[in-house]
């Protein structure tokens, strides 16, 4: 207990110091963490435009239809009423059905209501259609699941609808369509779909290389393990495993499958996790440099090159990505953190970080945590360091803290939309 209190105090002091230092480190040109953000210029959507520019029920938008919800179905408990006084519900059926929606839809709608009042003082958000129990929409409409709403402004000024659609995009709806001159259509992903795609993790079946030889499943890592990683220059080294930033035992997740041929490798990781990609210029020989860019797994494309452990196990080789696909696994999801901030998973070099597409920023943000771990290891005898964090299910508290701060100080588009599931409000 004393050690845990010491750890917490060290982390808090270190984190505060880091924030104070950031104001001095980010005053130069370019977008810095401590730099004041200017309001982003919003462009209204054009009539019949939809964002993202894919079909509504595809993976890149709101996802597939999962079945109609009725008042007698088991899934009816997934719907929650929205009594926000800043939203006007038309409720032409006079049943309150338009107020029922999924929690994700409710959260986005409430955020949009605030934006509408800020954009047009005296004007409120108006919902004309929400959950549909009467079959008035097309087959497999997301209205039947409480995942879609049709909206206008309270003054019904159609000249505002293009900007209303843009505000809906900014509020976080997964698909927004300027469907009709009379309304805007918005929809969201299913709750279980968001959870399955979110986070920055590897499957429990992934393996790491240990310092004393052999491999180990990532889910079995424990404090004291030293695993193969690489420094900023691509030199291989063994680094201490510190904790899991996220741990979901036996959960079902949707992973991106990155495959290479020369050398042959296959890595599974979630959309928001970072993977190092080599520079694009041609190289006839391996340079062993990791000076390439860290990209979200969802942004890696065939033809780009990732770093793979060579056959002799002595160096990293840039290997061309042969294919990128999606696969669902139920072996759990794990995000190991090493002192180096990198790790070789299934012989492929990856970052330990996710959510923000800046490996160096993320590694810097975890400096107070690494410092605390180092001090605690020096102050406590062997075996006395608390290990509960490595076995606790869910997202590490320090990661949650950084995510909250990042959401506050960074532009919304700097964070991966599937980086972390927002807690229900």
Curated annotation (Swiss-Prot):
GO molecular function: calcium ion binding; cholesterol-protein transferase activity; morphogen activity; patched binding; peptidase activity; zinc ion binding
UniProt-annotated site: Involved in auto-cleavage, residues: 270
GO CC annotation terms, alphabetical: endoplasmic reticulum; endoplasmic reticulum membrane; extracellular region; extracellular space; Golgi apparatus; Golgi membrane; plasma membrane
Covalent lipid sites (N-palmitoyl cysteine): 27
Highest taxon above the source species: Eukaryota
Entry-listed glycosylation sites: 282
Signal peptide: 1-26
Positions occupied by motif Cardin-Weintraub: 35-41
Protein name: Sonic hedgehog protein
Residue sites binding Ca(2+) 1 per the record: 92-93, 98, 128-129
UniProt enzyme class: hydrolase
Site, Essential for auto-cleavage: residue positions: 273
A biological process from GO: cell fate specification
Residues where lipid is bound covalently (Cholesterol glycine ester): 200
PROSITE patterns (alphabetical): INTEIN_N_TER
Protein species of origin: Gallus gallus
InterPro entries (UniProt xref): Hedgehog (IPR001657), Hedgehog_Hint (IPR001767), Hedgehog_sig/DD-Pept_Zn-bd_sf (IPR009045), Hedgehog_Signaling (IPR050387), Hedgehog_signalling_dom (IPR000320), Hint_dom_C (IPR003586), Hint_dom_N (IPR003587), Hint_dom_sf (IPR036844)
UniProt xrefs under Pfam families: HH_signal (PF01085), Hint (PF01079)
Tissue: Expressed in the posterior limb bud mesenchyme, the Hensen node, the notochord, and the floor plate of the neural tube.
Protein transport listed as a keyword: no
Residues carrying the site annotation Cleavage: 200-201
Positions that bind Ca(2+) 2: 93, 129, 132, 134
Induction: By retinoic acid.
SMART domains: HintC, HintN
